[in-house]
């Protein structure tokens, strides 16, 4: 199970359990997924005792129960909208990309050149982008427009890379996009006085997993 292995967190698979019940009404699949998540999380914690995600201080906002419900409903709405847009855009690009009348190696060179340009602006944003996400989670930048630009840059490049048919998946890039989206939402909430600065990483963690499931 990918989520527990990535975060060494057995309860991370509970998101996929909920999805299995809600979408497919498959209790057996849900139970199997939950057990797989517990085993995968245990094995990952045993083999890799040091997890970089453990350095993220996820401090829960000091809210009432009603305030937390409103927060989660807001995050659910934002994640659902952006997740749907991400899925639609990816499908459209996968249809358009093969129609580009250039040899395959030329298309690959285009992506390589774009990756080089991105690395000149922000080196850690290339690849999966998890190093950039971790740095933002531990020391969040407060410039919203810059984070929006980095998220859109990473999002567009990830969509074209995934649509190109190159080996590799979109698991880590999707997590990074969700985390950066969560950072943007959290920064807006900080400016509105709804949460504190130290709660940003908490919102980012929630949005990372939620965006992955939404997509």
Regions found by a protein language model. Name each.
Residues 1-215:
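Alpha-helical transmembrane segments and immediately membrane-proximal extracytoplasmic
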């Amino acid at each position: 199970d990918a989520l527990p292995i990535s975060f060494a967190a057995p309860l991370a698979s509970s998101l996929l359990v909920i999805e299995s019940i809600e979408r497919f009404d498959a209790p057996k699949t849900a139970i199997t997924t939950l057990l797989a998540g517990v085993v995968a999380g245990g094995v990952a914690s045993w083999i890799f005792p040091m997890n970089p995600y453990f350095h993220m201080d996820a401090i829960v906002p000091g809210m009432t129960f009603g305030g937390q419900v409103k927060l989660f409903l807001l995050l659910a709405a934002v994640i659902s909208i952006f997740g749907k847009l991400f899925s639609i855009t990816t499908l459209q690009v996968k249809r358009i990309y093969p129609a580009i009348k250039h040899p395959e190696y030329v298309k690959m060179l285009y992506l390589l050149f774009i990756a080089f340009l991105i690395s000149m602006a922000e080196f850690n944003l290339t690849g999966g982008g998890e190093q950039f996400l971790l740095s933002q989670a531990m020391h969040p930048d407060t410039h919203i427009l810059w984070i929006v630009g980095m998220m859109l840059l990473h999002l567009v490049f990830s969509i074209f890379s995934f649509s190109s048919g190159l080996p590799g998946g979109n698991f880590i890039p999707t997590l990074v996009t969700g985390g950066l989206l969560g950072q943007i939402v959290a920064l807006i909430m900080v400016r509105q006085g709804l949460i504190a600065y130290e709660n940003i990483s908490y919102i980012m963690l929630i949005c990372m997993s939620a965006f992955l499931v939404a997509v």
